Amino acid sequence: MTNSSKIRIALLVLVVLVLGLVSIFGDQYTKLVLMLAFLYMALGQFWNLLGGYAGLVSLGQQIFIGLGGYTLAVTVLYYGFPIWLGVLTGGVIALFFALVISPAIFRMSGVYFSIGTWVVAESLAIWFSNWEYVEMGQGLFIRPAKQLSVSQLYYLAMLVAVGSVALVYGVMRSKLGLALMAMRNDPGASETCGVSVFRNKLYCYLISSFCTGITAGVLYLNMVFIQPYKAFGIDWTVALLFIVIIGGIGTIEGPIIGAVIYVLLQQYLSDYASVSMLVLGVVAIIIMLIVPKGIMGTIQEKLGFEILSPRRHL
């Protein structure tokens, strides 16, 4: 291990320790804001794994957010599951649903894949809005979530965020990661060299869906209430696109930077809900004009600086 690698690891550990101390010394508002940043960071990492590395630009990531949230609500309310098991079950249900729809949506590519995932999400929103079992469009209160303190939720969200970064880094340093980067650069050539494009994209899609479902469960522990058109709404994907694009698509650090910017803007614009999406759109356009590869992508290109590089150096 080089000295620069040791310094980077030490800095990362220091950042995690400082964030951990916020739960002890920070006020409740700071903890709630950081909690949101952690969870959006994780959701951004898992979308980036699809769109940034595998080339699967999904407009339906809210499929797994909604399934994760509703599974948590149903299992803890109707069946008395422990909260941790409800969250884990949400990930399993999301993974199973991804496995079911993948043969159909993987027949599409490019913009058709994007539209196909969005159509599935909209279909689920309509179904859940008319399903009496989940109180239709009225939604469900996740009452057992109130048993958890803000500090407990904070540490749980922080664990999810750190886990998401570690997982994506590990995936991209594995054989699957090498295959994904080869496929992103030239799918035809990589398949000619023996890389199974379908299998590797499927693995990536399943990993992303499972982890998104779990993250959504933790998110809805904080939100307490879930409704179909919110849970399966396109607003989730708009937020994730904003986070990943301005932070730097195809970089591990990008969603971290993007999530912090998004949550801070969201808090600042909370009193201006009617124009918040417009402002976010303008900010995204300005950043894309100034730094087309996103903040971290441009830093890497201009300065060659990376904290968590998935590339292997020979």
Protein language model features and the residues they cover:
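Transmembrane alpha-helices and adjacent helix-loop boundaries
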Residues: 1-314
